[in-house]
Design a protein with these regions (language model features):
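Exposed low-complexity, polar/acidic, P/S/T/G-rich flexible segments that act as propeptides
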Residues: 62-83, 149-151, 221-236, 299-302
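Extracellular beta-strand ligand-recognition surfaces/modules
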Residues: 39-65, 114-124, 134-136, 191-221, ...
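A charged, solvent-exposed segment within the mature domains of Sec-exported extracytoplasmic proteins
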Residues: 91-93, 113-147, 248-251, 256, ...
Length: 302
C-alpha cells in the first residue's frame, strides 16, 4: 500500500538557495522501516546551507522513533562528522521525523548561522564547505521505531574471579540520563564512583567491566573512560589506551579486562594475563571504580 509507505526526502541547498528540496530518495514500507538503510542521491553540491534528511509522517506514526546517521559519503569517500551536533525529531511540528545535519535557518541556528558545525570545528558558519560533491551523496542510517534512546540507564560493575565467582550487576544505586531536549541528545550526571566490597577476589580477574544494558542499540559510539581504580584502597596505575569501549549488543561495556572480549586481543591495561587471569585486578577487600561517560556519538579528530 503506497499510502502506508514512509517517503524519505532530502533537502540540500547551497548559499544561493540552489539545490534540491524534498528530493524523494526512496519510499519504505512499514515492515522494512526498522533497520539500517543506505540512501543515494545523484547530483551536485558546492556547499551546504541546508542539509536535512526527512521521513515523512514517521514522527506521527511512530512517535517513539529515532534515526541515527552511521556514515556519509561524498563521491564515494566517507567524511567525518559529529552526530552529537545534529538535531533529531519532529523539528517543524508536522509529524515528519527530521535529522538536521546542517541548517543555517533551522533548529539551533543563530543569526542565520550554525554556532558549531557538525562537520568541522568552525564556529558561526552560514554554509558548510565540507559538504560538496560532483556526482553522488550516500547516507547510511539506522531507523529505530520502538524507542528514542532517551531515558535512565544503569552502569553495572561486573567482576569475575578465576573460579567464576562474580559480582554481576553491582551499581550502588548509580544511574545516568540520556536527555532529549530541544531536538538534541546529551548525557546528564554521567560521572561515577562505585565501590564493591568482597573477600572473594584475591586471586585476580577473568572479567572486569562496567556494563550498561540496552544503550548500544541506540548509541554504538558511546564513549567512556576509566578515571581511577582503587584495589583495597590503593590506587592502581594502568595504560588508559587499553581500557576500551566495547559491546555485547545491545549492551555497552567499558572493558578493563575480558578473557573473551576485546581486551583479550588488544592487551590488558593492568598487566599480562596468566592464562585467562589478570592477577593485578585481584583484591582482598574492595574494588573502587571511578569512570565517566563523555559522549553518545563518536567525536572525530578534526
Amino acid at each position: 500500500d503506497a499510502d502506508a509507505q514512509i517517503s524519505v526526502l532530502l533537502n540540500i541547498a547551497d548559499s544561493s538557495w540552489a539545490g534540491s528540496w524534498d528530493a524523494l530518495l526512496v519510499a519504505i514500507s512499514p515492515e522494512d522501516l526498522a533497520g539500517q538503510h543506505t540512501f543515494v542521491f545523484e547530483g551536485t553540491c558546492t556547499d551546504a546551507m541546508v542539509f536535512t534528511l526527512d521521513f515523512a509522517g514517521m514522527a506521527k506514526r511512530y512517535p517513539n522513533s529515532f534515526v541515527r546517521i552511521d556514515e556519509i559519503k561524498l563521491d564515494g569517500t566517507s567524511i567525518r562528522f559529529d552526530a552529537n551536533r545534529f538535531y533529531y525529531g519532529d523539528i517543524e511540528g508536522h509529524g515528519k521525523y527530521r535529522v538536521q545535519l546542517f541548517n543555517a535557518y533551522g533548529a539551533g541556528s543563530v543569526g542565520n548561522a550554525v554556532p558549531l558545525s557538525p562537520f568541522s570545528n568552525v564556529e558561526n558558519q552560514g554554509t558548510e564547505p565540507a559538504i560538496h560533491f560532483k556526482e553522488k551523496l550516500e547516507i547510511v542510517c539506522t531507523v529505530i521505531t520502538d524507542g528514542t534512546g532517551a531515558g535512565i540507564y544503569t552502569p553495572n560493575l561486573v567482576t569475575v574471579n578465576p573460579d567464576w565467582g562474580s559480582a554481576w550487576g553491582y551499581n550502588a544505586g548509580a544511574a545516568f540520563e540520556v536527555k532529549y531536549e530541544n531536538f538534541q541528545y546529551s548525557l546528564v550526571a554521567s560521572q561515577f564512583d562505585i565501590k564493591y566490597e568482597s573477600a572473594d577476589y584475591a586471586a585476580g580477574s577473568i572479567m572486569t567491566f562496567v556494563e550498561v544494558a540496552d544503550i548500544y542499540k541506540y548509541f554504538p559510539g558511546l564513549h567512556a573512560t576509566l578515571d581511577n581504580l582503587y584495589l583495597d584502597g590503593k590506587e592502581v596505575t594502568f595504560d588508559a589506551s587499553k581500557v576500551l569501549d566495547a559491546n555485547e549488543s545491545p549492551k555497552y561495556r567499558l572493558e578493563l579486562w575480558n578473557c573473551y572480549g576485546t581486551t583479550k586481543d588488544k592487551g590488558c591495561a593492568f598487566g599480562t594475563p596468566d592464562g585467562d587471569v589478570i592477577k593485578e585486578l585481584g583484591f582482598s577487600s574492595s574494588m573502587e571504580v571511578k569512570f565517566t561517560f563523555h559522549t553518545l556519538f563518536s567525536v572525530p579528530e578534526w
